[in-house]
Amino acid sequence: MGSTSSLYAAIDLGSNSFHMLVVREVAGSIQTLTRIKRKVRLAAGLNSENALSNEAMERGWQCLRLFAERLQDIPPSQIRVVATATLRLAVNAGDFIAKAQEILGCPVQVISGEEEARLIYQGVAHTTGGADQRLVVDIGGASTELVTGTGAQTTSLFSLSMGCVTWLERYFADRNLGQENFDAAEKAARKVLRPVADELRYHGWKVCVGASGTVQALQEIMMAQGMDERITLEKLQQLKQRAIHCGRLEELEIDGLTLERALVFPSGLAILIAIFTELNIQCMTLAGGALREGLVYGMLHLAVEQDIRSRTLRNIQRRFMIDIDQAQRVAKVAANFFDQVESEWHLEAISRDLLISACQLHEIGLSVDFKQAPQHAAYLVRNLDLPGFTPAQKKLLATLLLNQTNPVDLSSLHQQNAVPPRVAEQLCRLLRLAIIFASRRRDDLVPEMTLQANHELLTLTLPQGWLTQHPLGKEIIDQESQWQSYVHWPLEVH
């Protein structure tokens, strides 16, 4: 039997769903082994006196019996079970918890809203890339957490009494998706937010990250509809109009919205619109992890790395035995090219980061086979867990690696939605050229080059006589010029 001492479990008894995460510690990082989620909708079982109904408690216990089976193999000191908003509120929470502990065979801790917010922030800090100074938003079933912080350190923590289940029962009880129900839900949410808005704004943020089912649902809708993954107020308003158009909750149909998420989607959407409006949020992306990841990393006592993406790339390079020196060499050439065309092409810093990440992983396909290495690389990157990269960024990396050599598949570059299609094409061109000029695998054999962009025309200037002295190099560059010309990317080499 394999060792179980490296296994850890985190269980979150939420107001809408119960979740279990089982992971294995591998070289200072975590590998997910099991994720189980059950819609228990505990908050829906609270009556006006805040007593949980027997039916709701039974749904919860039934779910925990499933979880208990998986926990038998894990040391009790490596299991954490926490309960959140509904069990903070319920007057008979003690009855539920006593039986829950009996079923699971380990303690269940009811955590405060502030502790929940802190753990959510830790989960985000360990798993989400981007700028250091962030605002984290988590809309749960009965509470919403809002946290600001820098790096691993929180600067303000709030847990507010509103959630997608309680707002559903309160403002969409008639299952009618009319404008007036949305207005009432948003107005109430803004009223709850108002007392904390000033302090959140005072601490400020460079990026806003969402870590809940509502945000996950939005991400799935946007991916299904081919939009980019950034959540904006404009997109939220469009989705609200779509919901209003559907008329009733049971008739709610939006491309990419699963049946499972549909019930609490309008109420979560109303809360999110209120948050965007009240805090003047420009855009939000999906977090890589939240409460359960915060619990796991807390048990492991792992420090938050400054750059999650770098840690991920290092781990993948080690695991697939990628030649790190060569990856760095290609990255250096690509960065040099990027810096020379950045202003002409109006490229953003995130595009540079993603290009460098593609360089770091470009030879991963060789770990499968030289034949079809780009296809293997794309498959691996698309399917690996890459903390710090969003789903759309993973798709872009996979697409760049698929097109690192050979004829270009333009449609694949247009099907990703992390960056505009034109930017994906530009990054692809730079990656392909960087790989060619670093192919001798020695720093002293990379020529001094200048690259100029004039609209779509790239002009590459090499040292005098270089093409004559390097007949194989010339042949490869001629072939590359031809491949780029097939997709209307003009490339001149002197």
UniProtKB/Swiss-Prot annotation:
The gene is gppA. GO terms for biological process: guanosine pentaphosphate catabolic process; guanosine tetraphosphate biosynthetic process; nucleobase-containing small molecule interconversion. It catalyses: guanosine 3'-diphosphate 5'-triphosphate + H2O = guanosine 3',5'-bis(diphosphate) + phosphate + H(+). It is an enzyme of class 3 (hydrolase). Pfam families: Ppx-GppA (PF02541), Ppx-GppA_III (PF21447). The keyword Coiled coil does not apply. This is Guanosine-5'-triphosphate,3'-diphosphate pyrophosphatase. Pathway: Purine metabolism; ppGpp biosynthesis; ppGpp from GTP: step 2/2. GO terms for molecular function: guanosine-5'-triphosphate,3'-diphosphate diphosphatase activity. Its EC number is 3.6.1.40. Keywords: Hydrolase. Gene3D superfamilies: 3.30.420.40, Exopolyphosphatase. Domain 2, Hypothetical protein af1432. Belongs to the GppA/Ppx family. GppA subfamily. Catalyzes the conversion of pppGpp to ppGpp. Guanosine pentaphosphate (pppGpp) is a cytoplasmic signaling molecule which together with ppGpp controls the 'stringent response', an adaptive process that allows bacteria to respond to amino acid starvation, resulting in the coordinated regulation of numerous cellular activities. It comes from Escherichia coli O7:K1 (strain IAI39 / ExPEC).
